[in-house]
């Protein structure tokens, strides 16, 4: 692990732009995202450096902190990396892990053959904030709390199971550095702008890896078995984690859908001051527009109509209408005219005579100046409201419901003007009338009217 960068594993002293000094072991450097990760980090505060916000030193030791490169002011190497203590090439060894020394901060321990961090068995809960932070959004991460490490940590026996579980945590740290992700829940509570993440393992029982970007609660699930091979491909394991995360996300969406009961009515939302769309829907065909295979045949359509029957039916209607006119007591517009010459022509003999021109004669100037076509006296009654509405629906279609907004403009200005209150408006039809003003200009309410100004002005001038 230290072959690519010679300072990996060195003890680093870092000063941020907030004048806070940190000391820790250099874990990794991400050149793509310009971040630096330190392990076993301790904060020494501002240490009499000039700053607007002095920070006292802290006794807690953080598991690791990722710093943003643009916010680092100074970085020095305190101690070179410790020499690696490698085991002999024994084919019987599958995995190995060294326990920590008595001092958790001064002694780093040795890196394993796969570049993983040494594990520790005893941790204490955090006394820093008294709150738990969300898990880092990386695959396989089980680090859930922002905790501290005790200075007296016990010796962990060489257990391949713990080493295998911690390998997943170190691999997740590499993934976190390469992807540049950070937990959004850490931002409001971090003390320095350079601190991106400070996460510690919760307990000696490491839970199973969590899905990508999801919060993993602390669990007491037993450790994975020791049958995991040391030479397992890490890319294959990452692919498995990404495959598992998708069904879990789908299950989470399904659970959210089940929370809403199918028969429970949802509370309506009423917009104030905005507009609320109509509830009606257009009659849209689901199968798309109609498709015509051939052109319309006008000749065959006209052949279906029997013109003789239509003419016969039309004449029968005219005869019935004339019979109704004859039954009326007064002739059509015969007595309305005040002309004496016309009255003499409309004598009793002419009234009893039959029309020589036949029933198709609609205008006879000898009888009256007016014709029978434009006369409305033959109507028995006016159409009712229901008939008129039905006729309008057949002609123009069914209108949509009008938008029923609530609100409007209500201004309380000076000089006696008062805005409308958004009441009233048309109801029914396809167009909603604009909200009318209630009161219009309403003077004398805490203000002055124009008449008062003129009156006082005249008094001053007169005085």
UniProtKB/Swiss-Prot annotation:
Q: Which residues carry this modification: Asymmetric dimethylarginine?
A: 401
Q: What does this protein do?
A: Essential for formation of P-bodies, cytoplasmic structures that provide storage sites for translationally inactive mRNAs and protect them from degradation. Acts as a repressor of mRNA translation. May play a role in mitotic spindle assembly.
Tell me the name of the encoding gene. Answer: LSM14A
Domain DFDF: where?
284-320
List, alphabetically, the InterPro entries matched.
DFDF (IPR025762), FDF_dom (IPR019050), FFD_box (IPR025761), Lsm14-like_N (IPR025609), LSM_dom_sf (IPR010920), Sm (IPR047575), TFG_box (IPR025768)
PANTHER family assigned to the protein according to its UniProt record, in alphabetical order: PROTEIN LSM14 HOMOLOG A, SCD6 PROTEIN-RELATED
Alphabetical GO CC annotations of the entry are:
cytoplasm; cytoplasmic stress granule; mitotic spindle; P-body; ribonucleoprotein complex
Q: Which residues carry this modification: N-acetylserine?
A: 2
Compartments where found: Cytoplasm, P-body; Cytoplasm, Cytoskeleton, Spindle; Cytoplasm, Stress granule
In the record, Phosphoserine modifications are located at 178, 182-183, 192, 216, 227
Q: Matching SMART domains, A to Z?
A: FDF (SM01199), LSM14 (SM01271)
Keyword Phosphoprotein attached: yes
Q: Which organism is it from?
A: Pongo abelii
Indicate the quaternary assembly: Component of a ribonucleoprotein (RNP) complex. Interacts with DDX6. Interacts with EIF4ENIF1/4E-T; promoting EIF4ENIF1/4E-T localization to P-bodies. Interacts (via FFD box) with EDC4.
Which residues does this entry mark as bearing Phosphothreonine?
194
Provide ranges: composition bias, Basic residues. 269-283
Motif TFG box: positions: 380-400
Q: What is this protein called?
A: Protein LSM14 homolog A
Sequence ranges of Polar residues compositional bias: 147-185, 194-203, 217-230
């Amino acid at each position: 692990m230290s072959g690519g960068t010679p300072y990996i594993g060195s003890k680093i002293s870092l000063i941020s732009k907030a004048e806070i000094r940190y000391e820790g072991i250099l874990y990794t450097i991400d050149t793509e995202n310009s971040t630096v990760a330190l392990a076993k980090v301790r904060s020494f505060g501002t240490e009499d450096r000039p700053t607007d916000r002095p920070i006292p030193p802290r006794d807690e030791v953080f598991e690791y902190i990722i710093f943003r490169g643009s916010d680092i002011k100074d970085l020095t190497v305190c101690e070179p990396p410790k020499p690696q203590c490698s085991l002999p090439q024994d084919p019987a060894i599958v995995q190995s892990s060294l326990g920590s020394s008595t001092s958790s901060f001064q002694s780093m321990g040795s890196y394993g053959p796969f570049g993983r961090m040494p594990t520790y068995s005893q941790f204490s809960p955090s006394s820093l904030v008294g709150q738990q932070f969300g898990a880092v959004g990386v695959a396989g991460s089980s680090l859930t709390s922002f905790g501290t490490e005790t200075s007296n940590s016990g010796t962990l026996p060489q257990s391949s199971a713990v080493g295998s579980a911690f390998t997943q945590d170190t691999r997740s740290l590499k993934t976190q550095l390469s992807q540049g992700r950070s937990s959004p829940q850490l931002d409001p509570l971090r003390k320095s702008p350079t601190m991106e993440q400070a996460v510690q393992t919760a307990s000696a029982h490491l839970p199973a890896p969590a899905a990508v970007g999801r919060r993993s609660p602390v669990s007491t699930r037993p450790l994975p078995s020791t049958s995991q091979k040391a030479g397992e491909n890490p890319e294959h394991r990452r692919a498995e984690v990404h495959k598992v995360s998708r069904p879990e996300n789908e299950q989470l969406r399904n659970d959210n859908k089940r929370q809403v009961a199918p028969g429970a009515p949802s509370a309506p939302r009423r917009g104030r001051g905005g507009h609320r769309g109509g509830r009606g829907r257009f009659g849209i065909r689901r199968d798309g527009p109609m498709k015509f295979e051939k052109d319309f045949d006008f000749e065959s359509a006209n052949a279906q109509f029997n013109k003789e029957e239509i003419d016969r039916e039309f004449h029968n209607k005219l005869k019935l209408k004339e019979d109704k006119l004859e039954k009326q007591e007064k002739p059509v517009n015969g007595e309305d005219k005040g002309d004496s010459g016309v009255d003499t022509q409309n004598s009793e003999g002419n009234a009893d005579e039959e029309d020589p021109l036949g029933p198709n004669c609609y205008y006879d100037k000898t009888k009256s100046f007016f014709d029978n076509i434009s006369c409305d006296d033959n109507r028995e009654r006016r159409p009712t409201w229901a008939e008129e509405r039905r006729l309008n629906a057949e002609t123009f279609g069914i209108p949509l419901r009008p938008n029923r907004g609530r609100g409007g403009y209500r201004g309380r200005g000076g000089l006696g003007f008062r805005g409308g209150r958004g009441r009233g408006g048309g109801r029914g039809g396809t167009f909603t009338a604009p909200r009318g003003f209630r009161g219009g200009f309403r003077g004398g309410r805490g203000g002055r009217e124009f008449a008062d100004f003129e009156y006082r002005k005249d008094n001053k001038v007169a005085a």
